[in-house]
Every structure is written in structure tokens, then in C-alpha cells.
């Protein structure tokens, strides 16, 4: 019989540095497991103090789910109200500091924190699991359930500071979300969770987790033909441009299979899928699957949060939220993302620079991949501990066959080498468009810890409407809403799962966002333009206020000099 653990004791344990997560009413202490977690430490950090039942079931197979139970230290005997995790700025108290009148549970009242030390470095030593080095306050204060009745969550403020301009814009987006989404109270979110799990069970019973391996034979055949065509055009026809283009097309298609393998959605066997994915990503594509998984796992859990989701943290080049104007501290990268002089020049024009910037996206992935492997940012222990060395060998091999043998030895002139590299890499731009298309135009609001898993995924993700015969070109990224709800679902079954999601959305009253590829790109560009306009407005406001202050000082100095002359 499991011990009953009170809310106060759980708060105390988290304050003492334990990684406490709630799963199906069980209290799990993952403090010792976190260093072995194949999905990385950040994914667990964002679930501390929360009921992560839906997330844990969505991202893990049944065998792994059973392993969770070995880490239980007791259970709860009440409906759980989520704490704000330490990594997101949560405050936790020891037992002797707790009082009934100051419970950290969810409330319908606004609790305004003193944010004067926002993003300031914490002087005392860290003691909580995942606690960042700087002080972080969420947009919605700890323990608050935002609603339309709670005007503090979205009201516009009198502009006394340039930053208020951007803050008012973000508040308006929060208001729009509160108007269109179901209530955030615990009962409504619990109902959404139950309906989501009913849908999940229907998808399981329909056999949609069974992978059609013949479809992957077709995918690999197509990719193999593209590589063969690239080789033939270069070595037998001396068609450098079209050879590079074919190479880029093959890489673009490879990314989708690596994505599937990273989610363990092909064989559903952890080691097999990861080995397959690493061969494709590192050895053939020159990218780290481990980097992508660490990044992507956090993205799935805290989708479109400007402070925590690395997939929308692209300063100084892009900003998809005005909150990024604030010199925020990224809890993923563990550093400040400065809205510096360069960003102030680029972001106001980001809707025009969007496609040119994405054309060079693959070069940035090389940088991130090498940093991940060399710095050992992935798991160093457990069943994923050896991946780092396998990927390092893969990255070296890729640089040998592509940059040395093909570019360095086969191509004779500097211009030919430059052209081949640029054409092959710019061709992969399409996949970067497809990735950003799914989320850049969607909600970036912070709606507090009361928001459940299914609602967050639906409001932050977009699907792309395309004919079945074009599914190969999008590689499953056209079903990002479905994928975010069921990350382990085989890619070729996402279309079959789509009707279940549409029916679910109609039942619970959440918009299912889907656009054609052209229309979707237009929506993204419109969002980027809106943020660009806000950046221009804020910067113009700052400039005007500075001039006004300077003008007043000059007028005061002139008056003082005049009086001094008269007195003399």
C-alpha cells in the first residue's frame, strides 16, 4: 500500500531538490533517474510539480510507462493542482515555512509578484532541480488561473515606457485566446483530458500505431534514387548544379525519416529506431539526432513559449512574440537572448527577410549539432549514453565523404565548390519553411500551469491541407496538430488519425487550425509583419521619449544659463 503524500510534503521535497512528478495519482521521485533519462533532463525539469500523466503516456510506449512506477514514493488522495516548475520560476517552501493561508494552489485571484528582479542572476546557490541561474517570473503569476473576468491578465496599460507598447500587444493576444478557448479551471481541463484519452484509445484500437514498413521501403527507395541521380549527374554528366539540387532534395527527405525515428515511431524499439535515425541524420546528413531530440522534446512539452521553447527562439534574426523584445533568459540555452542593436535592425524587416534567412538554416544546424556532441549536452549515462560517440563518428564521416571527397577532391575550382555547397544546402530550405509553418503563426500566450496538454497542443500548432499524393513532399509535417497530440504515431498513419482530431475539436470547442500551403505561408508572414510593426513602434517610441527627455534637459540648461547671465 502506497503512502499518502500531502501537497505540502511534495512542495517541501521539491524545495529540497527532488524531481517530483505526478503520474496517474502516483508521486514519482525522478531525482536519481533524471541523469539517465534518454529524452534529456530539460523534459523532466518542465514537468516537476505537475500532473504529467497525459504527456508521459503520449511520449512513451507501454513498456516504458510501466517502468515509471518503480520510481514512486507514494500517492496523492486529491485532485492535483499543478505547481509552477522551478525551471519556469516556481517558488517552493520547506514545511516549516508553509502556512494554510498562503497555499500555492491555483486561484482565480490575481497575485501580482514583484518583478523588479526579473531575469537577474540569483546570488544564492541553486538547490532546486532545474532551477535556472536567473530569476524568472511567468507572464501569468504562479498559481493564477487566467480568465476573462481577471482583467489583470490582459488589460492594456498606459504607455509610460516603450516596453509597454509590446506588452499591450501581447496582452491583447492573451485576451483573444481567453475568448476563444475553453475555460482554464481544473474541472474543464480535466474533462478535456478525459476526452483526449478517449480519442487516444480509439486510435490505438484502430491499429494506427502499427507501422506500415512497406511505406518506408518506398521512402528509402525514393531517397536512394535521388542520391544515385546526384552521383550520376556529377560523375558522369558533369552537371554540378543539378547534382547539388538532387543532393539537397535527398537531404530534405531524410529529415522526415530521422524525425520519425527520433520519436520511436517506426519500430517502436528504442535502440533500433535511434540507430536507424542516427545513421540517417549524422552519417548521411551531417546532423545530430541527439541535439534534435533534446531540443524537440522540450518543444513538444512547452510549445511556443517564448521563454522556454527553443523552436521559436531565433533572435537576433526572428521574433514571433513581443516578449522576445525583453532580453529574455532562455531556460533551454541557459543564456540571455539579447534584443540587441543587430536585432533592432533586423526584426523590423523580418517578414521580408524570412525566406532568405531560412535558405541558410542548414548551416546553423551544423553548428548546433557539433556543439551538442562536443559539449556532451545529451544523456551521458543509461541506454542512450553511447549515442554521443556514435554520432561523433557519424559527423566526422559526413565531413569526410561530403566536404573532403566530393567537394574538396572531385570539384576542381573554388567557385564550383562554393556553388555546389550553396545549391545543395539552399535546396533544403523547404524543410525549414515546413517546420516554422506549423508554429510561427500560432499562439505564444502564457496561460498558466492550469492549461492541460491537449489544449496547449491545439492552440499552438497548425496543419497544412494538401492532397494525398503530395504527402511525401511534406513528410508528415503537414499533420503537426495530429503529431503533437500523438507524437509516437507512425507518420503514414497521421492522415487516418486526422478525422478523430477534427471530431475531438468540434466536441470540445477548440479550433482545429488548418490552411493550404500558400495560405499558411501568408498567415506566417502576416504574423511576422505584425511583430515587426510592434518592434518599429516600440523603437520609435523609445527614440521619441529619448529626444523629448534630451530636449527638456537642453531647455532647462538654456533657462539656467539665461538666468545666470541676468544675475551676473
From Swiss-Prot:
Metabolic or biological pathway: Lipid metabolism; sphingolipid metabolism
Keyword Membrane: yes
Annotated motif Histidine box-3, positions: 480-484
UniProt keyword Ribosomal protein present: no
UniProt GO molecular function: metal ion binding; oxidoreductase activity, acting on paired donors, with oxidation of a pair of donors resulting in the reduction of molecular oxygen to two molecules of water
Keywords: Electron transport, Heme, Iron, Lipid metabolism, Membrane, Metal-binding, Oxidoreductase, Sphingolipid metabolism, Transmembrane, Transmembrane helix, Transport
Motif (Histidine box-2): 296-300
Domain Cytochrome b5 heme-binding: 2-77
Entries under Gene3D superfamilies matching the protein: Cytochrome b5-like heme/steroid binding domain (3.10.120.10)
Catalytic activity, EC: 1.14.19.18
A GO cellular component annotation in the UniProt record: membrane
Residue spans of biased composition, Basic and acidic residues class: 549-560
Role this protein plays: Delta(8)-fatty-acid desaturase which introduces a double bond at the 8-position in the long-chain base (LCB) of ceramides. Required for the formation of the di-unsaturated sphingoid base (E,E)-sphinga-4,8-dienine during glucosylceramide (GluCer) biosynthesis.
Family: Belongs to the fatty acid desaturase type 1 family.
UniProt protein name: Delta 8-(E)-sphingolipid desaturase
Organism of this sequence: Lachancea kluyveri (strain ATCC 58438 / CBS 3082 / BCRC 21498 / NBRC 1685 / JCM 7257 / NCYC 543 / NRRL Y-12651) (Yeast)
Amino acid at each position: 500500500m502506497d503512502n499518502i503524500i500531502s501537497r505540502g510534503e511534495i512542495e517541501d521535497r521539491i524545495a529540497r531538490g527532488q524531481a517530483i512528478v505526478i503520474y496517474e495519482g502516483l508521486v514519482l521521485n525522478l531525482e536519481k533517474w533524471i541523469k539517465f533519462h534518454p529524452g534529456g533532463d530539460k523534459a523532466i525539469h518542465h514537468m516537476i510539480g505537475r500532473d504529467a500523466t497525459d504527456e508521459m503516456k503520449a511520449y512513451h510506449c507501454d513498456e516504458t510507462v510501466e517502468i515509471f512506477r518503480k520510481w514512486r514514493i507514494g500517492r496523492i488522495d486529491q485532485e492535483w493542482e499543478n505547481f509552477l516548475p522551478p525551471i519556469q520560476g516556481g517558488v517552493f517552501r520547506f514545511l516549516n515555512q508553509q502556512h494554510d493561508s498562503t497555499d500555492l494552489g491555483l486561484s482565480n485571484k490575481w497575485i501580482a509578484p514583484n518583478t523588479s528582479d526579473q531575469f537577474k542572476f540569483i546570488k544564492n546557490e541553486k538547490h532546486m532541480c532545474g532551477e535556472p541561474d536567473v530569476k524568472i517570473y511567468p507572464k501569468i503569476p504562479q498559481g493564477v488561473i487566467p480568465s476573462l473576468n481577471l482583467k489583470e491578465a490582459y488589460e492594456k496599460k498606459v504607455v509610460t515606457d516603450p516596453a509597454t507598447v509590446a506588452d499591450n500587444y501581447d496582452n491583447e493576444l492573451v485576451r483573444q485566446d481567453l475568448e476563444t478557448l475553453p475555460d482554464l479551471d481544473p474541472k474543464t481541463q480535466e474533462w478535456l483530458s478525459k476526452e483526449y484519452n478517449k480519442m487516444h484509445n480509439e486510435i490505438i484500437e484502430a491499429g494506427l500505431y502499427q507501422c506500415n514498413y512497406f511505406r518506408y521501403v518506398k521512402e528509402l527507395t525514393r531517397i536512394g534514387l535521388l542520391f544515385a541521380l546526384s552521383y550520376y549527374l556529377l560523375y558522369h554528366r558533369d552537371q554540378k548544379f543539378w547534382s547539388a539540387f538532387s543532393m539537397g532534395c535527398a537531404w530534405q527527405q531524410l529529415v522526415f525519416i530521422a524525425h520519425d525515428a527520433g520519436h520511436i515511431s517506426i519500430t517502436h524499439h528504442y535502440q533500433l529506431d535511434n540507430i536507424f535515425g542516427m545513421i540517417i541524420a549524422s552519417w548521411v546528413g551531417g546532423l545530430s539526432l541527439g541535439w534534435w531530440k533534446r531540443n524537440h522534446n522540450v518543444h513538444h512539452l512547452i510549445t511556443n513559449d517564448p521563454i522556454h521553447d527553443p523552436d521559436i527562439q531565433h533572435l537576433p534574426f526572428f521574433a514571433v512574440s513581443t516578449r522576445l523584445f525583453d532580453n529574455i533568459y532562455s531556460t533551454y540555452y541557459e543564456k540571455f537572448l539579447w534584443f540587441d542593436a543587430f536585432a533592432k535592425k533586423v526584426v523590423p524587416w523580418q517578414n521580408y527577410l524570412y525566406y532568405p534567412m531560412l535558405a541558410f538554416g542548414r548551416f546553423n544546424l551544423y553548428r548546433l549539432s557539433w556543439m551538442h556532441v562536443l559539449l556532451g549536452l545529451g544523456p551521458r549515462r543509461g541506454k542512450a549514453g553511447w549515442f554521443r560517440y556514435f554520432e561523433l563518428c557519424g559527423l566526422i564521416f559526413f565531413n569526410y565523404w561530403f566536404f573532403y571527397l566530393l567537394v574538396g577532391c572531385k570539384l576542381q575550382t573554388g567557385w564550383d565548390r562554393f556553388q555546389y555547397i550553396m545549391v545543395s544546402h539552399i535546396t533544403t530550405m523547404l524543410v525549414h519553411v515546413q517546420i516554422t509553418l506549423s508554429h510561427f503563426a500560432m499562439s505564444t500566450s502564457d496561460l498558466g500551469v492550469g492549461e492541460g496538454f491537449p489544449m496547449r497542443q491545439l492552440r499552438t500548432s497548425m496543419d497544412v491541407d494538401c492532397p494525398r499524393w503530395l504527402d511525401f513532399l511534406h513528410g508528415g509535417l503537414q499533420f503537426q496538430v495530429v503529431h503533437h497530440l500523438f507524437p509516437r504515431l507512425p507518420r503514414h498513419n497521421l492522415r487516418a488519425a486526422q478525422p478523430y482530431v477534427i471530431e475531438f475539436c468540434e466536441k470540445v470547442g477548440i479550433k482545429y487550425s488548418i490552411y493550404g500551403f500558400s495560405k499558411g505561408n501568408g498567415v506566417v508572414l502576416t504574423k511576422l509583419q505584425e511583430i515587426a510593426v510592434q518592434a518599429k513602434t516600440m523603437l520609435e517610441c523609445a527614440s521619441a521619449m529619448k529626444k523629448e527627455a534630451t530636449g527638456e534637459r537642453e531647455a532647462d540648461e538654456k533657462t539656467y544659463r539665461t538666468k545666470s547671465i541676468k544675475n551676473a
